[in-house]
Amino acid sequence: PTLIGNKNSIAETAKNLSLDISNFKIVEAKDEEDSASVACQMSNENRSKIIIKGNLHTDILMRSYLRKEFNLLDGRRLSHIWHMTTPQLKKPLFITDGALNVLPRIDIKLQILKNAVQFYNKLNSHKPKVAILSGTEDPIESMPSSADAKKVMELASEEKINAFIHGP
């Protein structure tokens, strides 16, 4: 892994969290914009497979990501994945999409699901468990997100997305 940012701040944070980052590469960056640019440039040059945002504003990373010179757009829908760990859970949670897509159509929701599964598979070797959430367990007309969840599950099954998918 490569960490990008203020080396002293990175080292202090790792120490405070009791994390051993001695095998990590650390690239100095002067500020958030520089960190985002360095990450996108590294991805453009195939020196990284995934950009994982830490203590960096999403809008700053997205501005860099969208710059044409980095050539990172591949025609797929962009989506946001939040990686969450807690002491109570033995496995991390990946939550999508909480930051980029507002009121997505069903086809966009399916693409967001595909993005999340593809991301997960870059980090893990086993089949992910996916929960498509809504405010109710069964699809009902008065809650469109529940009907959308059912449709996304059906489409995911047809497309044979390699994940255990349940919901709403």
Regions found by a protein language model. Give the residues of each.
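Anion-binding alpha/beta catalytic cores of soluble intermediary-metabolism enzymes, centered on
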Residues: 1-168
